[in-house]
A protein has these predicted regions:
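Condensing-enzyme catalytic core mediating Claisen C-C bond formation in acyl metabolism
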Residues: 9-23, 29-67, 74-75, 197-270, ...
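Conserved beta-ketoacyl condensing-enzyme motif
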Residues: 15-16, 40-153, 186, 266-301
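Predominant activation on well-ordered alpha-helical scaffold segments within soluble catalytic domains
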Residues: 33, 92, 96, 131-135, ...
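Active-site pocket-shaping loop/turn-to-helix segments
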Residues: 73-96, 150-161, 204-217, 240-268, ...
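Glycine/charged-rich beta-loop-alpha catalytic/anionic-binding loops adjacent to active sites
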Residues: 140-152, 196-205, 302-312
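Active-site-proximal alpha-helical scaffold in enzymes
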Residues: 151-181, 214-230, 316-338
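Acyl-CoA/ACP chain-elongation machinery
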Residues: 176-196, 243-252, 278-291, 305-341, ...
Length: 379
């Protein structure tokens, strides 16, 4: 049986008022969303980064890595021996995009909290690299320390959990604005080697694998009144969050039970199912887990089920995934999926954590249609 559900209902009083991103398919959130919506990817061979093992090394040459790599930014920061500098570079670009969209002017740093997910379980990278990351990040964005700066080394769903921490700090009055996000890149040879060795990376030798990617994304959480004071119309309201942990059975998996238990508390009896955004990345086990979970949820999800898995375009973006899904999800609710009132985001991390978060599409106080022509949406 899976671990006891740790659902924590969230009162719908904090909104997503701005987002920022940088990715292989966009220099900002708007470009990235446009590319993801159109299924336009930039996956390419990257032999200078890594070469995957051949099925028969004695008779076949190594195969160039196919990855979703950022090529529109200067690569001078991409030092194979200093991944923290590159991650800080990506984070700074996404942060700057958010800052511009948030319409901040003279907002003091002491009213802002920064929450960032960084990769865990990577060779020669961890908590000891946080000072280097933070120093470089502050230099690049040109800002001093914020009131709260919390960095968590985790996996695809970590940023969803950070939204809960940020919400708590907002309610406690420690901050007025919470900037939550993540940055990750698999494109370092010392990180790719063990993944390739263990048949995780997609190649001719291993068709059941994922395409490595790199991205950074941030979102701004605050009270609606704070956003409107700066002339912004919020994208969505944070409406709920849930978390469970997988406990493997004798068969080696939990048949999707933990994931289903993370999602169930966030599903209502409304006529239409929410838009689903997830971290499916091409690996068979993750797809099987979702298939099992879907069968358990069949009475709670009203057809047709709408599912978006951006890794098809961006590749697997690791610890940045949760923030990426939120940043894309709020836009999907106002464009491609306007008939859906909610977006449910779920992540199934390698560590066994199953995170889910619910967003409610924002409407004006009068209940009228969302104005796409002005304010924050679709800048």
């Amino acid at each position: 049986m899976p671990a006891a559900n740790q659902a924590s209902p969230v009162q719908p009083d904090y909104v997503v008022s701005a987002v920022g991103m940088v990715s292989p398919v966009g220099a900002n959130a708007t470009q990235t969303f446009t590319s993801v919506r159109a299924n336009l990817s930039r996956k390419r061979e990257c032999p200078q980064v890594f070469e995957c093992r051949a099925e028969d090394p004695d008779s076949e040459p190594a195969e160039p890595l196919v990855a979703s790599a950022i090529g529109h930014l200067t690569t001078s920061e991409r030092d194979q021996e200093q991944p923290a500098r590159w991650l800080a570079f990506l984070a700074a670009h996404a942060f700057s995009d958010l800052w511009e969209n948030a319409s901040f002017s003279t907002e003091p740093n002491q009213s802002i909290g920064l929450y960032c997910s960084l990769p865990k379980d990577r060779p020669a990278f961890g908590v000891s690299n946080q000072p280097e990351f933070l120093s470089r990040f502050h230099d690049l964005v040109g800002k001093d320390a914020f009131a709260v700066e919390h960095f968590e080394f985790g996996h695809s769903g970590t940023a969803l959990g950070l939204c809960e921490m940020a919400r708590a700090h907002l309610r406690e009055g420690r901050i007025r604005h919470a900037i939550v996000g993540g940055a990750d890149s698999y494109l370092f040879s010392q990180w790719l080697n063990p993944l390739d060795e263990n048949y995780r990376i997609k190649s001719t030798r291993n068709l059941d694998g994922f395409c490595p990617g790199e991205t950074a994304a941030f979102l701004l959480l605050e009270e609606e009144s704070q956003a409107r004071q700066r002339g912004l119309v919020p994208w969505a309201t944070l409406a709920g969050a849930s978390k469970t942990n997988r406990v493997a059975s004798i068969a080696g998996h939990d048949a999707g039970e933990a994931l289903a238990n993370a999602i169930k508390p966030l599903l209502s009896d409304q006529a239409s199912s929410p838009l689903l955004l997830c971290d499916l990345n091409g690996e068979r086990d993750r797809f099987k887990g979702w298939g099992y979970a879907l069968s358990r949820l069949r009475t709670r999800l009203t057809p047709p089920v709408a599912l978006e898995h951006p890794a098809m375009v961006l590749g697997d973006v690791g610890a940045a995934t949760g923030a990426v899904l939120i940043a894309l999800g709020v836009r999907f609710l106002h464009t491609k999926y306007r008939e859906r009132d909610h977006a449910l985001i779920w992540c199934a991390s390698d560590s066994g954590e199953r995170n889910a978060l619910l967003l409610r599409r924002h409407t004006s106080p009068t209940g009228g249609p969302f104005d796409l022509s002005g304010g924050n949406p679709c800048p």
